[in-house]
């Protein structure tokens, strides 16, 4: 009986856990699941993945796109160092982390990392998307968004 009640509470918690809609997230006007024109990108041939290729733009080597080999759709994006790249959710390298919270809300998980770095994670359970932001002293250092 006690196990049944505990299971009910766990299932209820998981279903009621907050999720954030990340389906329209963009970095440099690029969106997950959008097709890319491979001619406008540089393929990173140093890293070999089974189902994906990694690409960068000619003028932005610090913005990396993980692209499905089969359908050329963007499955993930990682941004570091480049302070000129904008997002549509308030996140920008060296920008304030509170700008992201203002745009996306407080339904995130947070972890402490080494050397005063922190990790903020937003989940979109409906669209299977994860947004991870590493920051230090409220200044964003790295932005990653991936879908399954």
PLM region descriptions:
Residues 1-12:
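Hydrophobic membrane-insertion alpha-helices, especially the h-region
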Residues 21, 29-73, 83, 92-139, ...:
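A cross-family detector of function-defining hotspots
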Residues 77, 83-87:
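Terminal, regulation- and interaction-focused segments at domain boundaries
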């Amino acid at each position: 009986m006690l196990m049944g009640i505990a299971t009910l509470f766990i299932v209820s918690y998981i279903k009621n856990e907050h999720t954030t809609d990340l389906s329209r997230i963009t970095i440099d006007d690029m969106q997950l699941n959008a097709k890319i024109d491979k001619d406008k990108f540089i393929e990173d041939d140093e890293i070999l993945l089974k189902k994906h290729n990694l690409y960068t733009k000619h003028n932005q080597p610090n913005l990396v796109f993980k692209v499905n080999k089969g359908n050329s759709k963007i499955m993930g994006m990682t941004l570091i160092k480049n302070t000129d790249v904008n997002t549509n959710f308030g996140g920008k390298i060296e920008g304030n982390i509170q700008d992201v919270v203002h745009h996306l809300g407080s339904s995130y998980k947070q972890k402490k990392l080494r050397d005063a770095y922190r990790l903020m994670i937003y989940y979109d359970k409906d669209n299977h998307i994860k947004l991870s932001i590493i920051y230090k002293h409220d200044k964003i250092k790295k932005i990653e968004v991936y879908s399954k």
